[in-house]
């Protein structure tokens, strides 16, 4: 077996402190929902630019090179 060090004991106590526990209530659901909505908006904008249904002045989409 290896030696026990103070740093190893500290890191082990920090790393295993929340293992198997569930945060009561909503937890991180609102944050993840907000990030999901931002991702959805980003993907819709990219799709509209690709389909040229979102017209931007001074920005031409030419896929032929």
Swiss-Prot record:
It is found in: Cellular thylakoid membrane. One of its GO terms (molecular function) is phosphate ion binding. The keyword Phosphoprotein does not apply. Gene3D superfamilies: Photosystem II reaction center protein H. Pfam families: PsbH (PF00737). It comes from the Bacteria. GO terms for cellular component: photosystem II; plasma membrane-derived thylakoid membrane. Keywords: Membrane, Photosynthesis, Photosystem II, Thylakoid, Transmembrane, Transmembrane helix. It is a single-pass membrane protein. The chain crosses the membrane at residues 27-47. One of the components of the core complex of photosystem II (PSII), required for its stability and/or assembly. PSII is a light-driven water:plastoquinone oxidoreductase that uses light energy to abstract electrons from H(2)O, generating O(2) and a proton gradient subsequently used for ATP formation. It consists of a core antenna complex that captures photons, and an electron transfer chain that converts photonic excitation into a charge separation. PANTHER family: PHOTOSYSTEM II REACTION CENTER PROTEIN H. Belongs to the PsbH family. This is Photosystem II reaction center protein H. It comes from Prochlorococcus marinus (strain NATL2A).
């Amino acid at each position: 077996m290896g030696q026990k060090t103070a740093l190893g004991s500290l890191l082990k106590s920090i790393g295993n402190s929340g293992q198997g526990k569930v945060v009561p209530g909503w937890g991180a659901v609102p944050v993840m929902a907000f990030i999901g909505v931002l991702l959805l908006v980003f993907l819709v904008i990219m799709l509209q630019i690709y389909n040229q249904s979102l017209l931007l002045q001074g920005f031409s989409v030419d896929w032929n090179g």
